[in-house]
UniProtKB/Swiss-Prot annotation:
Annotated segments matching region Required for ubiquitin ligase activity and protection against ER stress-induced cell death: 31-82
Domain of life: Eukaryota
Species lineage: Eukaryota, Metazoa, Chordata, Craniata, Vertebrata
Molecular-function annotations in GO: ubiquitin protein ligase activity; ubiquitin-like protein conjugating enzyme binding; zinc ion binding
Entry text on domains: The RING-type zinc finger domain is responsible for E3 ubiquitin ligase activity.
The protein, known as: E3 ubiquitin-protein ligase RNF185
Stated role: E3 ubiquitin-protein ligase that regulates selective mitochondrial autophagy by mediating 'Lys-63'-linked polyubiquitination. Acts in the endoplasmic reticulum (ER)-associated degradation (ERAD) pathway, which targets misfolded proteins that accumulate in the endoplasmic reticulum (ER) for ubiquitination and subsequent proteasome-mediated degradation. Protects cells from ER stress-induced apoptosis. Responsible for the cotranslational ubiquitination and degradation of CFTR in the ERAD pathway.
Classification via SMART domains: RING (SM00184)
GO terms of biological process kind: autophagy; defense response to virus; ERAD pathway; innate immune response; positive regulation of type I interferon-mediated signaling pathway; protein K27-linked ubiquitination; ubiquitin-dependent protein catabolic process
Membrane-topology descriptor: Multi-pass membrane protein
Length: 194
């Protein structure tokens, strides 16, 4: 940044003192492209639209900075240097050829429309549903039931809540629960008489 100042003043001095016009025009064109690149938003890295500058000296598009501030209402810091920043701590920039002199901070981007995604349909049988407790049974080898800690400490977060009584899913779960209980009783009775 410090090197740009002397080259600009040197090219201005050479053109004002009657230096060669070819070198000053090539420097002027080079400065123009560099000048266009210096007015980039530090968030979207595009040419700043409705440019504002923070008190710490960083340039932003107002729509980009507004979105940045809205998504972090509790911690409003500059995206570049993490200095404190707010709507009141930015200064609008009005360049040559700008048509509107309206403060860009007064124009907030429109709020996006809300969208409600449809719930995920898991389908199929979700598990046992003894009452509303969502009883879980686990099997193991010998005296080591593998699922006792998950059942005792309720670590099984992946299971959905039981079905609401009166729904077709609840009726299906009750039917399957009774069917498995009947099968278990038949097997136990068969083991007793064998």
């Amino acid at each position: 940044m410090a090197s740009k100042g002397p080259t600009t003043s040197a090219s201005t001095k050479s053109s004002s003192t009657g230096g060669t016009s070819g070198s000053s025009s090539s420097n002027g064109a080079g400065d123009n492209t560099n000048q266009d690149n210096t007015f980039e938003c530090n968030i979207c890295l595009d040419t700043a639209k409705d440019a504002v500058i923070s008190l710490c000296g960083h340039l932003f598009c107002w729509p980009c900075l507004h979105q940045w501030l809205e998504t972090r209402p509790n911690r409003q810091v500059c995206p570049v240097c993490k200095a404190g920043i707010s709507r009141d701590k930015v200064i609008p920039l009005y360049g040559r050829g700008s048509t509107g002199q309206q403060d860009p901070r007064e124009k907030t981007p429109p709020r996006p429309q809300g969208q409600r995604p449809e719930p995920e349909n898991r389908g199929g049988f979700q598990g046992f549903g003894f009452g509303d407790g969502g009883f879980q049974m686990s099997f193991g080898i010998g005296a080591f039931p593998f699922g006792i800690f998950a059942t005792a400490f309720n670590i099984n977060d992946g299971r959905p809540p039981p079905a609401v009584p009166g729904t077709p899913q609840y009726v299906d779960e009750q039917f399957l629960s009774r069917l498995f209980l009947f099968v278990a009783l038949v097997i136990m009775f068969w083991l007793l008489i064998a």
